[in-house]
Amino acid sequence: MAAARVEYIAPWWVYWLHNFPHVDLSLRQKSPDFNPKDPGYQQTLLFVALIVALCAAVNLLFVSVYLICLCCCKKEDETETKKTSSCCVTWTAAVSGLLCCAAVGIGFYGNSETNDGVYQLTYSLDNANHTLAGIDSLVSNTNFKMKEDLDKHLFRLNEIFAARGDYVQSLRFMQQMAGNIIQQLTSLPNWQGTSVNLSDIARQTSTIEYYRWLSYLLLFISYVVICLVTCVGLAKKSKCLLLIMLCFGLIALMLSWTSLALETSSAMGTSDFCVAPDKFIMNMTHDQITTEVVHYYLYCSQSLRNPFQQALTVFQRSLTTMQIQVQGLLQFAVPLFPTAQKDLLGIQLLLNTSESNLHQITALLDCRGLHKDYLEALIGICYDGVEGMLYLGLFSLLAALAFTAMVCAMPQAWKHLEARDRDYNDIDDEDPFNPQARRIAAHNPNRGQLRSFCSYSSSMGSQASLQPPAPTVSNAPVAEYMNQAALFGGNPRYENVPLIGRGSPPPTYSPTMRATYLSMTEEPSSIYSNVFPA
């Protein structure tokens, strides 16, 4: 056993939690001593949980009032606040997401610490239960051998040595020593009830801890999923995802406060036990085990007297006396009564087995083994266990703050998306620079489709037979352009009018270029006149 663990000293956070006021539901001060069967003490733990529940109610009331005010407030100058609101929503979502991730990280550590502490507690309880069960098994086995097996051998030897009074007297003395051994073994504590209680406590604690650990693990995963889906909803500007995550955020907020209430009351009750665990154990076992025995195992000091020393000493002396008697009978009686050798050797083997059991009982009854299990159980639950519960409480508090900010930010994001859609829908559909009109024009073009030029290259004769109609000059583009120019206070420039529909080439062409241009446009003029009507 490590020297640092010889004496148990409760950590400072245990005293910090233990010094909290213990008030019952009638607001009266109660003793902080751990007594889970006392209704008054149960009310003190319930009062702590109700304080946390009151904080949760205030938090939910604040969120509700904020959401109602946000929905009912009149729209002010949105154009001035839209950019600020969008930036605020972004930063709030980012901070709440980081806070939630930090809370989940702290929660993972706290959950692991609590699980380690409870595992160490159950492991120590199992070891102590194994020790006590071993003592009971050895004591019952030795008692059975002394009562049943030894009596059978002595009965047959009495018949063999009936003619020798001195040998019969030795057998009676051995019977008396066996009675002393049985009496001393009976005086030892009966650990059967205690071992059963330890086994039940270890099994129930292990089962509860497994479901607690699994529940927190699922809670961590759900919190991370809510944060990720909320970020996806904000990135994709999805109102449906934001609405769903708003509902899940409220549920997560209530779960955070609920877990905080459970963790606070559990940590406070465990701290009350860890401040004075020996006092509680002595009160619980006073009707099963003597106070001297419990005190011997709880403190295990060299200055304390071993309460089993006298019984074990009598046991050892009685065995030694019986072995001396058997050795004498083997030496002097067997030559006279050869048939007695088998029973005497059987008694000798029984005494050797009983001596081996005595050494094992002495080792198991020593306080160092059970005291080590006791210290390890205390360190597991009072150090790792309570520390883990404090970290879980911090996780719940940070998660509650994160989801409060997230729930308050999502309606702002909703309003921002609604304002964006409303501004988008208010754009004039006839505006040629409207992005929506551009998309509609791209997907549903209204202009005529250009015919393939390959269809006109099938036969030159058919092209030659086509006579181009006389080009009709349309003044519609010119008039439209002039109207637009006059509207904006400018002078119309005919040079900027498109060349579609004009029969003459540009005035800047040279005569050679003009002749080339006319020769190239004579035949396909009918084609272009159909494709691009004037």
UniProtKB/Swiss-Prot annotation:
Keywords attached to this entry: Calcium, Cell membrane, Chloride, Chloride channel, Disulfide bond, Glycoprotein, Ion channel, Ion transport, Membrane, Metal-binding, Transmembrane, Transmembrane helix, Transport
Predominant subcellular localization, coarse grouping: membrane
Record's bilayer topology term: Multi-pass membrane protein
Lineage top rank: taxon: Eukaryota
Residues in compartment: Cytoplasmic: 66-87, 235-240, 410-534
Disulfide bonds: C274-C382, C300-C367
Reactions mediated catalytically: chloride(in) = chloride(out); L-glutamate(out) = L-glutamate(in)
Statement: the UniProt record of this protein carries the keyword Kinase: no
Alphabetized GO MF terms: calcium ion binding; volume-sensitive chloride channel activity
Residues in compartment: Extracellular: 1-44, 109-213, 262-388
Known glycosylation sites: N129, N197, N283, N352
A cellular component annotation (GO) from this entry: plasma membrane
Cellular localisation: Cell membrane
Motif segment (RGD): 164-166
InterPro entries cross-referenced by the UniProt entry: Tweety (IPR006990)
Annotated binding of Ca(2+), by residue: E113, D116
Function noted in UniProt: May act as a calcium-independent, swelling-dependent volume-regulated anion channel (VRAC-swell) which plays a pivotal role in the process of regulatory volume decrease (RVD) in the brain through the efflux of anions like chloride and organic osmolytes like glutamate. Probable large-conductance Ca(2+)-activated chloride channel.
Family: Belongs to the tweety family.
Protein name listed in UniProt: Protein tweety homolog 2
